[in-house]
Amino acid sequence: MLRYLTTRLLYTIPVLWLVVSVVFLLIHLVPGDPIQQMLGEGATASDIQSLRHAYGLDVPIGRQYVNYWKGVLHGDLGRSLRLDQPVTRIIAQRYPWTLQLTLAAMIVALLISIPAGVRSARRRNRWDDRALSFVSLLGLSFPNFALGPILILFFAIQLALLPVSGAGTVAHLILPAITLGGSLAAILTRMVRTAMLEELSQDYIRTARAKGLSENVVVYKHALRNALVPVLTVVGLQFGALLAGAIVTETIFSWPGIGRLTISAISSRDYYLVQGCILTIGLTYVVVNFLTDFFYSLANPRIRQ
């Protein structure tokens, strides 16, 4: 067990290093000078050089790369060019909002997909099974950048039930969570249906029915419990997709999370803030996948062999 987890952990380190390194290289290859952009056209060469030196941008890119990783190892992600604040402080303020949105989206997806998937499996090939399959397929076809404006138009503008943007209350969280969790709910509904159909065909289910157990006990106590093991694993693996989707969702709803911060940092070419955001998102993805592997290995010891 310990050897398996150690191996999985060692695999994550080069992946995280590669992601941050590629982002570092790409953002430095984009034409233009962020210092010039920040100071404006009226800045003198002396002003530009002075500020480049202050942010460590006056040395070769290789040296900047080494200096950046030295800072990371000491917990220093640099200083934002645009906001003139430590990147760690900015991310610490924004990250909890993204985590809140992502967890809410996962809860929404599970609350929708588990009952829908179970219902679809129990009513296989009947009208409600076909209807749920059609709705889940429709959900897969709707990206969050299309679903978000539709929800805003209907619930916020036409019905005036929920706020359009902002954060701070449960009402502000509802539309972004549904937007972000919609596609995941569609994926999980199909997975729950498939897993339930497989479990309901097993011998132990026939034995439980032969003992006279009620259908609800057979379905929810026996079949669903086993069917959820692979489903919950997919939930963990889909966490990265939710983080990526949060970038668009936060922009649509003006949610003050790290996704919206990343877009803003990229548009202003804020080197250190972009790298800090990507590092944080990558680290979150790696940690969640590691925990998913850990809990799945507990539930299914065969994968450790």
Language model regions located:
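Hydrophobic alpha-helical transmembrane segments of membrane transport/permease proteins
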Residues: 15-66, 156-175
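Alpha-helical transmembrane segments and their lipid-water interface positions
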Residues: 74, 147-148, 197
